Regions:
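A short alpha-helix capping/helix-coil boundary motif
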Residues: 1, 45-48, 169
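Short loop->beta-strand "edge-of-pocket" segments that line small-molecule binding or catalytic clefts
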Residues: 1-12, 30-36
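Surface-exposed, flexible loop/turn segments at secondary-structure boundaries
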Residues: 12, 40-42, 87
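Catalytic-loop motifs flanking and including active-site residues across diverse enzymes
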Residues: 13, 17, 120
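Ligand-binding cleft/hinge of the Venus flytrap
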Residues: 16-61, 68
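Pocket-lining segment of extracytoplasmic ligand-binding domains
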Residues: 44-154
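An extracytoplasmic/periplasmic, membrane-proximal ligand-sensing/linker region
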Residues: 152-169
Length: 169
């Protein structure tokens, strides 16, 4: 029954984080008490409305508080966020990663499962694909071309231009 903060329970990164914790470590989402709210700024509104399913303990934090502030005060046991909290980057006492050697843990997870956690995906409505049969293939080609341009840009600099954790692996 740990108390864990997250900007939005339904955000992409916390979704796959919960999946990994469940699949790899047997920690079920409904065994955790969840609190949602602004990570660094108070009063954050959810971008996507979400109603927690029965059995899930999910409540918003007070509007005048932030997740980081509550975490630093010991009112939350942990955070699941897409961005490092300032309390971690500022090396506040008693604040650390769940996996201190996270790069090795991430690589090992990929080696074991073959899964690279995604952030976003694109979908196409079936009625549009049926009405315009050329559309799925054209969208696919556009994304492949975009990816190829991005890969070319990666080779142009001596410093990483993206935050892909395993780009050098």
């Amino acid at each position: 029954g740990k108390l864990i903060g997250t900007p939005e329970y339904q955000m992409t990164a916390p979704v796959w984080m919960r999946g990994i914790l469940g699949d790899q470590y047997g920690i079920k989402s409904n065994e955790i008490r969840w609190r949602s709210g602004g990570q660094e700024e108070a009063g954050r509104d959810e971008r996507t409305p979400f109603e927690a399913p029965p059995g899930l303990d999910l409540e918003p934090i007070p509007e005048d508080r932030t997740l980081v502030e509550m975490f630093e005060a010991g009112e939350l046991d942990g955070l699941t966020t897409a961005r490092e909290p300032s309390s971690y980057t500022m090396r506040k006492p008693n604040i650390d990663r769940l996996f201190p050697d996270f790069r090795s843990a991430e690589k090992e997870y990929y080696r074991e499962t073959g899964i690279y956690p995604i952030m976003h995906l694109m979908g196409l409505r079936k009625d549009l694909a049926e009405k315009h049969p050329w559309l799925p293939g054209s969208l696919y080609k556009a994304f492949v071309e975009s990816r190829d341009i991005a890969y070319q840009d990666l080779a142009k600099t001596a410093a990483l231009s993206v935050a892909l954790p395993w780009v050098a692996a």
